[in-house]
Amino acid sequence: MNKAQKEVQQAQLDEEKKVIRLLEVVYERAKKDCEQKIMELSARTDLENLQSIVYQKEYQQMMVDQLEAMLYDLHEGQFTTIADYLEQSYINGYVGMFYDLQSTGIPLVIPIQQDQVVKALKTNSKLSSGLYTKLGEDVGYLKRSIRAELSRGIASGSTWNEMALRIAKGMNSPFRKAYNNAIRIARTEGHRIQNEAALDGQHGAKKKGADIVKQ
């Protein structure tokens, strides 16, 4: 790996660190909102002495319904964050390839073709159901996990505050699993897109007569 290639790789690593920090902010906000919402609902005096299982189930549903907006914001936030990162990964890979060429004495630059970006980000995606839908699966998992944790908490006699803390901050928190999966998707797709962008650039350079040596 030559100096130019190392610089390009470092730029991509910096972008990866940035998206991980942004995802952490998105998830921390969601966890805090979740914890606060459960604690607010638990403070309602008309729901202090729930005895009936039916009422408990209704309360669980009320909790989950109240968290719908928070989960929607989480879905939208992580999708936007990762989508922006993947587009930047394409730019890094494409521009980086020509930067590498210039470092070897070939002063060639070809503008990025938007249809190639769309193809790399969507058509050639390795995700089975698309980025938005794939991330939505984790949000759906979060919703089911929150409901299950509320059921376990009621059965074991936990307080609502204890349940809120387990859901938001426990080592096995559903938020942690979804967060880790979002990072995995960003990393694997970002790497694939960067490589595909470099190949697109190489094909374009070859058409212009550049002698490309396979890296």
Regions found by a protein language model. Give the residues of each.
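Acidic, glycine-rich two-metal-ion catalytic cores of nucleic acid-processing enzymes
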Residues: 164, 175-215
